[in-house]
Amino acid sequence: MATIHVDGKELEVDGADNLLQACLSLGLDIPYFCWHPALGSVGACRQCAVKQYTDENDKRGRIVMSCMTPATDGSWISIDDEEAKVFRASVVEWLMTNHPHDCPVCEEGGHCHLQDMTVMTGHNERRYRFTKRTHQNQDLGPFISHEMNRCIACYRCVRFYKDYAGGTDLGVFGAHDNVYFGRVEDGTLESEFSGNLTEVCPTGVFTDKTHSERYNRKWDMQFSPSICHGCSSGCNISPGERYGELRRIENRFNGSVNQYFLCDRGRFGYGYVNRKDRPRQPLLANGAKLSLDQALDKAAELLRGRNIVGIGSPRASLESNYALRELVGAEHFYSGIEAGELERIRLVLQVLKDSPLPVPNMRDIEDHDAVFVLGEDLTQTAARMALALRQSVKGKAEDMADAMRVQPWLDAAVKNIGQHALNPLFIASLAETKLDDVAEECVHAAPDDLARIGFAVAHALDASAPAVDGLDSEAAALAQRIADALLAAKRPLIIAGTSLGSKALIEAAANIAKALKLREKNGSISLIVPEANSLGLAMLGGESVDAALQAVIDGSADAIVVLENDLYTRTDKAKVDAALNAAKVLIVADHQKTATTDRAHLVLPAASFAEGDGTLVSQEGRAQRFFQVFDPQYLDASILVHEGWRWLHALRATLLDQPIDWTQLDHVTAAVASSSPQLAAIVDAAPSASFRIKGLKLAREPLRYSGRTAMRADISVHEPRTSQDNDTAFSFSMEGYSGSTEPRSQVPFAWSPGWNSPQAWNKFQDEVGGHLRAGDPGTRLIESQGDHLSWFASVPRAFNPAPGTWQVVPFHHLFGSEENSSKAAPVQERIPAAYVSLAKSEADRLGVNDGALLSLNVAGQTLRLPLRINEELGAGLVALPAGLAGIPPAIFGKTVDGLQEAAQ
């Protein structure tokens, strides 16, 4: 710690910070533009000027940039010095000379850091009367709008996009006061993190195009704290609603998880919530709509006297899955996950519980100094983790700078010192990945061969680990280099997962973790699972969807209740058809129209994450609560959407002729927690419904929320009472606490007086860029309890397919491989057409060129797909895009026994 003096006040700060960060952490206001907590300091904008004095006797002082000045012990500075204030006001005035002053029509208005800083400096009069510089805007794709005339040349966009996220297609062109931030030519931004430009940019240059179509100001939206359902990373989000529609998603700061950034799937994939074809009333097979009571009575009538199986879902909350389990009985509850995938997820859970190495949170990943990624294409399967890995490899430059006594926040200096030095990252994958550019070495091979390399690394680390027979010398040498790098590191990290359908990859990663612990290395292990609640569902229990379908086919059950799951995306279509044909009753509770709801005798309209509350467990083992954003019935009483757990508990009560005893979320969450010691801590994931600040509930709406009395005027001039939320500590209103002074971990939207942009998160943190003052949201359910793992000894044989056969492997796509986000119109523009991928050597052997139409026979099906030649894919492999339309879900791992150019 260091003692500094600010305008005569003696204050304690972190001496490792710069003055800007230190003062902001104290709650003092200094305007800034180019600095960002995640990007460090470059001193480009000159906006954060303060007066620095030699000591208490110095009356003259000198102007310094606070972001470039360390907060050394004994520093004397002034923020309120008149010369410093005039300097800051003049900087804003210079920046505004070419700004269009178009706040009333700018989509950033009311959400704009430039507005906040202009007001903060007191600049309120335009003196510039000359021609303004203008630019041509670019079409940057379906996610981002571009308005270059608003640019103040802070350089934040390129520093994030290129330096932080590793993007290559956004740059800065020109010189002096005529610079241009964009692409060489119009075109979709290629980075999977491009959406963060909308929050990183302090002005309205980059704005959310998906929000533009149905735009409203930030102060006119209703928000809630929520969790992204796009993958298993558990990123925190702030969804905003107006008129019963989800309008945009912003990043919600969680210092242990996503911090300031999201991937584009999580930010722009919300459109499925607004789809017109969603079930919003209970529906019979003939299309007849039912009231709530009629639906419950009909469901009970259909199920009475039946042998029921319940099929849950890894995209549904723990509460909803538990309610289904209570309805049908634990022995008749099935997870809704394909058998092989469920086996792998259970293995992940076992390894994480028994591993001698801890599971890192997302932020912690950035602090590891050697990483081995085994089998995962992280940018496509856990994109936010890939972004964290990019920061981990940069730790080498920070170490070099530290040796030269250069502070890590001096971004340009650290880059100059480090040049191209990176911490070692090794990637073993099917083919090239978006992280290959920062990897020390990459190897591309079949899943079994990748696993063999992993087992060999474990054996190289510790000779007691199972050896790999018949490993070629090149692979053995690579395994030794990886082992040496992991041993040389202070904090090595192993990452694997389920995406390639290989248990052996997970087992190899577990062996490496055990070997590292035996070598007394302070490392970590992280394992990726497919969906938002895959790990939570594995903790809850239940057999595979295949077992459920087989029970119906065999006649042991004749009724199926499906929760938020499209069975046709899980397993073989013929098997699903056979089970649904055999079932006398099919009831589906879902928020989407799917092939399964099309077969249902009764559809119960379930709530999406925006309309309901629940708990998810991320791949880290962090239980986190998502909260209802809006009440759809407030604007349309005919909508009968309810959380899955409400429908299923009410149905159970109707069947048993009992009263409903889960009347609020806390009741069902407590029931889930009491059902298993492993889930006992989920009650601590968020405050209960009784939580208050100064006697107030927490406001979902900003204080300036307008138009509430007019929103239903077309229905009735009599304004109804706002919806009452008995489930949570939040109110569907601006009435309630919305400030930043009282600590709270669940923050619907970031706002503080004078701070309307996302930079307002500064006011909620213990120190800027640190953690929330009340603690980061969520609670960990998995902590390392010592080494309880035995060596996994089933090393697979080397991949050697029979002549004329190929193994089907999955290529995952951030846009397209996840079911719900793929229903969002902007995301659909980024989804590739279905294809088949082969190695160049295989294409040459078949005599086909890129783009040729191929016919392949696999698992009794014939597919006709265009060819994409992949130079890095191994021989004997056929890669298909997982999750895309036209690609059967049960095809991966199967053998292709007929592959040829299709007859036109």
UniProtKB/Swiss-Prot annotation:
A GO CC term attached to the entry: membrane
UniProt KW keywords: 2Fe-2S, 4Fe-4S, Iron, Iron-sulfur, Metal-binding, NAD, Quinone, Translocase, Ubiquinone
EC number: 7.1.1.-
Disulphide bridges, residue numbers: none
Needed co-factor(s): [2Fe-2S] cluster; [4Fe-4S] cluster
Residue numbers binding [4Fe-4S] cluster 3: C228, C231, C235, C263
Cofactor note: Binds 1 [2Fe-2S] cluster per subunit.
Domain 4Fe-4S Mo/W bis-MGD-type: 221-277
Domain 2Fe-2S ferredoxin-type positions: 1-83
Protein residues bound to [2Fe-2S] cluster: C34, C45, C48, C67
GO BP annotations, alphabetical order: ATP synthesis coupled electron transport
Amino-acid positions noted as binding [4Fe-4S] cluster 2 in the UniProt annotation, renumbered to this chain: C151, C154, C157, C201
Domain 4Fe-4S His(Cys)3-ligated-type: 83-122
Pfam families: Fer2_4 (PF13510), Fer4_Nqo3 (PF22117), Molybdop_Fe4S4 (PF04879), Molybdopterin (PF00384), NADH-G_4Fe-4S_3 (PF10588)
InterPro entries with a match to the protein in the record: 2Fe-2S_ferredoxin-like_sf, 2Fe-2S_ferredoxin-type, Asp_de-COase-like_dom_sf, Mopterin_OxRdtase, Mopterin_OxRdtase_4Fe-4S_dom, NADH_UbQ_OxRdtase_75kDa_su_CS, NADH_UbQ_OxRdtase_ferredoxin, NADH_UbQ_OxRdtase_Gsu
Lineage top rank: taxon: Bacteria
Induction trigger: By low oxygen growth conditions, especially in rhizosphere.
Reactions performed catalytically: a quinone + NADH + 5 H(+)(in) = a quinol + NAD(+) + 4 H(+)(out)
Enzyme class: translocase
Purpose: NDH-1 shuttles electrons from NADH, via FMN and iron-sulfur (Fe-S) centers, to quinones in the respiratory chain. The immediate electron acceptor for the enzyme in this species is believed to be ubiquinone. Couples the redox reaction to proton translocation (for every two electrons transferred, four hydrogen ions are translocated across the cytoplasmic membrane), and thus conserves the redox energy in a proton gradient. Required for plants roots colonization.
Family per similarity comment: Belongs to the complex I 75 kDa subunit family.
Descriptive protein name: NADH-quinone oxidoreductase subunit G
Protein's organism: Pseudomonas fluorescens
Gene this protein is translated from: nuoG
